[in-house]
Regions:
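Helix-coil boundary and N-terminal low-complexity module in membrane systems
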Residues: 1-190, 201, 220, 225-239, ...
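Juxtamembrane "helix-exit" motif on the non-cytosolic side of transmembrane helices
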Residues: 190-196, 267-276
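Hydrophobic alpha-helical transmembrane segments of polytopic membrane proteins
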Residues: 211-222
Length: 358
């Protein structure tokens, strides 16, 4: 009895006992919300590499940031009053008296300003190169992120340059258009926020906000279409406008994801402070930018597939790509027991089983 119990206890270490087998898991939707997180987790290294491409490829923007931050400018003081020179002369000639002090206190007030230097204009010139690099980077990264969303094998370096070489003309042209449109919208918003207030200004502000959001959503689809179809830029823009309105549900979810990333960045900088400022600087350089881009591509591609690709293949089934693995020989089955697997392994290696020895 004791031997039997001992044998039963040690049975848990017996590799020949039948295994639990594979459980039946419900299949995930190819374009579903849950699959986004699975795909993101499985490809986080590649998405990080895409972020590096975005940062290094758009290097001219760092020169513009340096200019806007004032690092290339010199300090100066500008008087508020046109009578500053007269008051200043009286102050110098008459000396310090109650009258000159009163006059200088009224007309001698100055404000601190930053004035451009030669280095500022050099940085402006270097920063303007963004109009040439922006389209290339967006095309290359859109191709990589689209393939990740589709579940295809991705080779980040070669895929990036393949997409750039294949679409460089459209990427260059639309990259310039993209920078100009984005710059105009940002400039209008800045002036409307910090300019004079009024009913007309308020209406113009909200109209600009709506246009900016609409164009931001259109950009989900522009570069994905560029690397997927052979279409003219005008047709790509037209289709993107249609997709921005038709695919509202997916577009809004992606927009909320982008806003969540920006909100976290805001918290790290202004709410938490301290060591979290380091995270606020590091995250956009490592993962945040490509994460937001992947959200947009994931939302866009499957809507494009639903409304353009699948209907086309239904009308032209002979052009549908054939699955190259469909007719491959089965290498492993899951309908056999662990004991049968072990017997097969022993047979292949010329090892006799206990039954054969008997």
């Amino acid at each position: 009895m004791e031997k039997k119990n001992k044998k039963t206890r040690l049975k848990i270490f017996d590799i020949t006992r039948d295994g639990k087998g594979l459980g039946k898991k419900p299949s995930m939707s190819r374009s579903g919300f849950k699959r986004f997180f699975v795909s993101y987790k499985d490809n986080i290294g590649k998405i990080t590499s895409v972020n590096i491409f975005m940062i290094l490829g758009n290097f001219p923007i760092f020169f513009l940031v340096a200019v806007l931050a004032g690092y290339t400018k010199a300090e100066a003081y500008l008087p508020f009053s046109d009578l500053f020179s007269g008051y200043s002369g009286a102050f110098v000639s008459e000396g310090v008296t109650p009258d000159t002090m009163a006059m200088f206190a009224i007309g001698g007030v100055q404000k601190h300003i930053l004035v451009p230097t030669a280095l500022t204009y050099v940085f402006y010139a270097l920063g303007s190169l963004i109009v040439f690099t922006f389209g290339f980077v967006n095309v290359g990264t859109a191709y990589i992120l689209r393939n990740i969303a589709k579940g295809e094998p991705v080779f980040v370096w070669s895929d990036f340059w393949y997409a750039v070489k294949r679409n460089w003309r459209q990427a260059l042209i639309y990259g310039i258009i993209d920078v100009l449109i984005t710059g105009i919208l940002a400039f209008n918003l800045y002036n409307l926020v910090f300019g004079e207030t009024g009913f007309v200004t308020s209406m113009m502000f909200w109209a600009t906000v709506i246009l900016a959001v609409l164009y931001f959503i259109m950009r989900y689809y522009i570069y994905v279409q560029m690397v997927t179809f052979k279409l003219s830029i005008s047709k790509i823009i037209k289709n993107s406008l249609i997709f921005a309105l038709v695919g509202m549900k997916r577009n809004i979810v992606a927009l909320l994801g982008v806003l969540l990333c920006l909100f976290l960045e805001f918290l790290f900088v202004f709410a938490f402070g301290g060591i979290f400022i380091s995270f606020a600087v590091a995250l956009p350089l490592i993962i945040f930018i490509s994460t937001m881009a992947y959200m947009k591509v994931y939302a866009a591609y499957f809507k494009i597939e639903e409304l353009i690709i699948e209907p086309y293949y239904e009308e032209h089934p002979e052009e549908r790509p054939v699955d190259e693995y469909e007719n491959d020989e089965v290498l492993m089955r899951d309908d056999v027991t662990e004991r049968e697997r072990l017997a097969e392994v022993k047979a292949r290696n010329g090892i006799r089983t206990n039954d054969e020895e008997e």
